[in-house]
Amino acid sequence: MYSTSKEIIMIGYSTIGVKDIEKAKKFYCDLFDATVQVDVGRLAMIGKSADAPMIAVCTPYNGNAPECGNGTMVAYTMSSKDEVKAKHAKALSLGATDEGEPGQRIDDVFYGAYVRDPDGNKIAFYIFG
């Protein structure tokens, strides 16, 4: 049964596995002009504030190498198509690899761009419209 509640469910944070925690903290802090909100050594939560959505980077708890999920992607909403373009370019300048240049993906519905961070995690920047 689906809920009929009008309450919006908001993601608090998404976690991705990384090889080098210091390199990952720098990449995401620089990419989003954000800061580390929580740092417990093998895990760091990065965002604008601790009460807003964050990205968490961590070395896997089991000690194994991190693996990118097949079909897994973290998508970040932008305020304009120009911001999608700028964030894509900034990610590339910080060492990300291109997975799809900025462009209209669904006519009049979805404009996006895709990269992989230095650990291979797929990221999207998008705006509806």
List where the protein language model places each region:
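Vicinal oxygen chelate
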Residues: M1-E7, I11-K19, S49, A65-G129
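N-terminal beta-strand motif that seeds the catalytic metal site of vicinal oxygen chelate
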Residues: M1-K25, A52, V74-Y76, G129
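Conserved active-site alpha-helix within GNAT-family acetyltransferase domains
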Residues: E22-L31, A113, K122
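Hydrophobic pocket/interface hotspot
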Residues: A24, Y28, V84, A91
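Conserved acetyl-CoA-binding loop of GNAT-fold acetyltransferases
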Residues: D30-Q37, A96-T97
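Conserved short beta-strand elements that form part of the metal-binding/catalytic scaffold
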Residues: T35-G69, I123-I127
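A cross-family glycoside hydrolase active-site/sugar-binding cleft signature
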Residues: C58, A75-T77, E101-P102, Y126
